[in-house]
Regions:
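Bacterial N-terminal signal peptides that target proteins for export
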Residues: 1-8
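N-terminal alpha-helical modules
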Residues: 20-132
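Bacterial N-terminal signal peptides
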Residues: 8-16
Length: 132
C-alpha cells in the first residue's frame, strides 16, 4: 500500500510539473524558473537545481509579504496571522514529508521539493491578496 501511495504521489507531481505554465502565472513563479525547467531536459538533478533556485526566490517573496502584512495589521490581526502562519508551516512540512517518501527514490525527492516550492508560492500569493 505504501508503494502505491508513493507511485501515486510521484506520478501526480510529475504530471503537475508538465502543466506548470498556467499555474506559474497564477501563483507568481518566475520566468527564470520556466526557462530553467525547459532547459533541464527532464534530468532530475537539473530539475532539482531549478526548483532549489526558485524556492529561494519564493521564500524571500513569502517572507517579504508576511512582514508587509504584519506591519499593516492591528494587534489582533498580527496574532491571528502569526497563529495561521505557524499552523501553515506545520502542515506544509508534514505534507512535504509525505511526498518525500524514503521508499520513493529520486522521484520522491523531486516530488517533495516541488511540493515545497508550490506550497510556498501559493502561500505568498494568498498573503499578497491582503495587500490589495
Amino acid at each position: 500500500m505504501r508503494k502505491l501511495s508513493t507511485v501515486a504521489a510521484v506520478g501526480m507531481t510529475l504530471l503537475c510539473l508538465v502543466k506548470v505554465s498556467a499555474q506559474d502565472e497564477k501563483i507568481g513563479l518566475s520566468r527564470d524558473y520556466d526557462v530553467c525547467m525547459d532547459k533541464s531536459g527532464g534530468v532530475t538533478a537539473n530539475m532539482l537545481d531549478c526548483i532549489g533556485a526558485e524556492t529561494k526566490r519564493q521564500d524571500a517573496r513569502l517572507n517579504k509579504i508576511y512582514k508587509d502584512v504584519m506591519a499593516h495589521a492591528d494587534e489582533a490581526g498580527k496574532k491571528r496571522l502569526l497563529e495561521a502562519q505557524r499552523a501553515w508551516i506545520k502542515f506544509r512540512d508534514a505534507d512535504v514529508d509525505f511526498y518525500r517518501d524514503p521508499n520513493g527514490g529520486t522521484a520522491a525527492t523531486l516530488a517533495g521539493s516541488d511540493r515545497y516550492l508550490m506550497m510556498t508560492a501559493e502561500r505568498a500569493a494568498e498573503l499578497e491578496k491582503f495587500k490589495e
